[in-house]
Amino acid sequence: MGVVVVASNAYTRNGLRGYCTIMNKTRYVVINQKQPEEEQRVVAGHEAGHLILHKTQLKGGAAMQDFDVYNVSSRLERQANFFAADFLIDDGDVLDLMHSRDADFFNVAKELCIPSPFFAFKLYSMVNRGHSMRVPVDLNSTFLK
């Protein structure tokens, strides 16, 4: 994919988690390294989702800045989260853990070393692709739509 990834401490005050942009045909992802490592992985995957899915919005050097990567009010942010969840988390790992005897939402997220809000995107994606499992939200709600 050819992406320059930069870990930065420059955005600690304003809460910026990460951003991506395309300048002179070079793709950039900047991640706030003051976040826990598991959050940095999520932000990296989320920004990769923007670079792949939202090229049009990034034309002309525009940046997609993320202060809340779990934002569900924006279609573009949801798409980037679903991309990241499917890219970073293997379906088989989720299925194996969900079928263990002491599986619950939070334990599985912890075992996968991912934040629980991010795990909700993975479960929702898997249910939409036909997997049957318990999910933490009512799928008839507007939470991820």
Regions of interest found by a model, annotated:
Residues 1-145:
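Active-site hotspot residues in diverse enzymes, especially metal/ion-binding acidic/histidine motifs
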